[in-house]
Amino acid sequence: MRLIQLWILLMVSGMCFAQYSDHQLYQAYLERDMRVWQEHIASAEWDSLSIEEKKQLLNYEYGFTAYMLGQDAHEAQRLIARYEQHLNALKEQLPAARYHAYLSSIYTYRLGLDRKHLMKYASKIYDNINLAMDLDDNDALVCAMQGNVEFYSPFGSKKQALEYFQKADSLYRSEAKLHEKWNRCAVQLTLVQCLIKLDRKEEAKGLCAQYIAAEPQFELMKQLLPQCD
């Protein structure tokens, strides 16, 4: 009887974070089925997770919160608070560069919901991403976030953004972590968008076709292809 109880306990504790596998979450990202991400994040019991599982969940929260900014401002506000709470809980376990890169994204999300405080948030965004780059400019996530800052900021440089995206793509390719495959696809998407903005549409079209050939279910990339003409 005790063995059965132990088996049930182990099964339940494992389910605290394993509602969806990294592969399923990656496929959901490609197919733009973010309901899967929402269910996965909502079902995770933070206190029951290992440090590594918490780090992986934080990365999914980073991505899903960005998605929700364009869907539901009230829910996005709640997710930002949760994301920040989890980031603070992992401050000592994360590499310092990643901590400051994630913190930069939190201020970016807040700015997305509160344009009245542009200068306040912009300063914190740049301070944290610049510090992250100083600490480790060979971290793929850090490079990708620096690229995002350059790409989306009205004061940024699309040319520099492209260089950061290219470097991040290369770093993600060499690291090949399943739970970060979606991050690489996000980088590839903004890389193509950056080429379009720089009026390098032939190059953008070639890369776009290449990425779709590699991942035929990549919906956002397929939607981007007509913009390359």
Segments from the language model and where they lie:
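N-terminal signal peptide c-region/cleavage motif recognized by signal peptidases
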Residues: 13-16
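Terminal, low-structured helical/coil segments at or just beyond the last alpha-helical repeat
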Residues: 178-229
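Amphipathic alpha-helical repeat scaffolds of TPR domains
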Residues: 20-24, 47-70, 94-113, 137-154, ...
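Short coil/turn connectors between adjacent alpha-helices in alpha-solenoid helical repeat scaffolds
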Residues: 25-35, 65-79, 108-122, 152-162, ...
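Primarily a tetratricopeptide repeat
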Residues: 39, 78-81, 85, 120-123, ...
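Amphipathic alpha-helical segments of tetratricopeptide repeats
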Residues: 42-46, 84-88, 92, 127-134, ...
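Eukaryote-skewed repeat-based solenoidal scaffolds used as protein-protein interaction platforms
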Residues: 106-153, 164, 168-174
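Sec-dependent signal peptide recognition
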Residues: 2-9
